[in-house]
């Protein structure tokens, strides 16, 4: 008797469903395995790229930053120093969020921000800087360096002057507000021929300089000499005075020529207005302090500063070198130290 065996029959639709289910389960398992592997990886500090013109498209390793200490002038010095030293050493530079909050509302700065959450995960090597350039700073070791100190010296960054001026370009609305104010000024009914920004640093320095640093702040005589220097050299100058001691300025600056305007608001917590006014002038009279130094540096033109304002044995001279703070072409007028000698 002939027996014919029929092949096992399995519906095609069921077969397709079976294959799809198995494939899906396999794919999900693979994805879960990858995610688990990523979770198990240790946290890595990124290697960051830079568009540094000096180094071209090469990758720059590590991360350099600087402590944000002090007010506007200090933080401008810290920013410019970080910018220059990082470029000199071929490292990417990042600024603290605090520094960004101080500078970004005023200037078109370009360095990226290092937020605190990221900074706390990095094994920093603290590196103290003097307030002047040292040869050893050209070859600073370490990939993750955080600078400390109060650097504010042209010796760090003057070779990059045009780049620094670009970094500290005022935002349009800040510049335009200052220029609008200056356009409205007159000298004895006529438009000024030259604008001279005057910054008079007082505030805490009035007490700190004589009591801590064996020094003085600018007095009436110094300011009179500085104003007369410009009056003798320029036709119809106008002096735009800013200060954190405006009441003292009104009492001690001679206004009999009709060429002095007390323009600044002197608010230390929001210095943009005063700083913008100074930098939109043609020349600068400063007294002491980094605010005035930076105003003069960005303005260009002629600059007069208070010179020799401490006694020779002042501890201030251990952390401050006048020749590293004031450009060689600026003109200093010696301070009157007699009030210190009386005591």
Curated annotation (Swiss-Prot):
<keyword id="KW-0325">Glycoprotein</keyword>
<feature type="glycosylation site" description="N-linked (GlcNAc...) asparagine">
    <location>
        <position position="308"/>
    </location>
</feature>
<comment type="similarity">
    <text>Belongs to the glycosyltransferase 11 family.</text>
</comment>
<feature type="topological domain" description="Lumenal">
    <location>
        <begin position="29"/>
        <end position="343"/>
    </location>
</feature>
<dbReference type="InterPro" id="IPR002516">
    <property type="entry name" value="Glyco_trans_11"/>
</dbReference>
<comment type="pathway">
    <text>Protein modification; protein glycosylation.</text>
</comment>
<keyword id="KW-0735">Signal-anchor</keyword>
<feature type="glycosylation site" description="N-linked (GlcNAc...) asparagine">
    <location>
        <position position="188"/>
    </location>
</feature>
<feature type="glycosylation site" description="N-linked (GlcNAc...) asparagine">
    <location>
        <position position="282"/>
    </location>
</feature>
<dbReference type="GO" id="GO:0008107">
    <property type="term" value="F:galactoside 2-alpha-L-fucosyltransferase activity"/>
</dbReference>
<keyword id="KW-0808">Transferase</keyword>
<keyword id="KW-0472">Membrane</keyword>
<keyword id="KW-0328">Glycosyltransferase</keyword>
<dbReference type="GO" id="GO:0032580">
    <property type="term" value="C:Golgi cisterna membrane"/>
</dbReference>
<protein>
    <recommendedName>
        <fullName>Galactoside alpha-(1,2)-fucosyltransferase 2</fullName>
        <ecNumber>2.4.1.69</ecNumber>
        <ecNumber>2.4.1.344</ecNumber>
    </recommendedName>
</protein>
<feature type="transmembrane region" description="Helical; Signal-anchor for type II membrane protein">
    <location>
        <begin position="15"/>
        <end position="28"/>
    </location>
</feature>
<dbReference type="GO" id="GO:0001936">
    <property type="term" value="P:regulation of endothelial cell proliferation"/>
</dbReference>
<dbReference type="Pfam" id="PF01531">
    <property type="entry name" value="Glyco_transf_11"/>
</dbReference>
<comment type="function">
    <text>Catalyzes the transfer of L-fucose, from a guanosine diphosphate-beta-L-fucose, to the terminal galactose on both O- and N-linked glycans chains of cell surface glycoproteins and glycolipids and the resulting epitope regulates several processes such as cell-cell interaction including host-microbe interaction, cell surface expression and cell proliferation. Preferentially fucosylates gangliosides GA1 and GM1 in the antrum, cecum and colon and in the female reproductive organs.</text>
</comment>
<keyword id="KW-1133">Transmembrane helix</keyword>
<feature type="topological domain" description="Cytoplasmic">
    <location>
        <begin position="1"/>
        <end position="14"/>
    </location>
</feature>
<keyword id="KW-0812">Transmembrane</keyword>
<dbReference type="GO" id="GO:0006664">
    <property type="term" value="P:glycolipid metabolic process"/>
</dbReference>
<dbReference type="GO" id="GO:0009312">
    <property type="term" value="P:oligosaccharide biosynthetic process"/>
</dbReference>
<dbReference type="GO" id="GO:0031127">
    <property type="term" value="F:alpha-(1,2)-fucosyltransferase activity"/>
</dbReference>
<keyword id="KW-0443">Lipid metabolism</keyword>
<keyword id="KW-0333">Golgi apparatus</keyword>
<dbReference type="GO" id="GO:0030155">
    <property type="term" value="P:regulation of cell adhesion"/>
</dbReference>
<dbReference type="GO" id="GO:0036065">
    <property type="term" value="P:fucosylation"/>
</dbReference>
<dbReference type="GO" id="GO:0006486">
    <property type="term" value="P:protein glycosylation"/>
</dbReference>
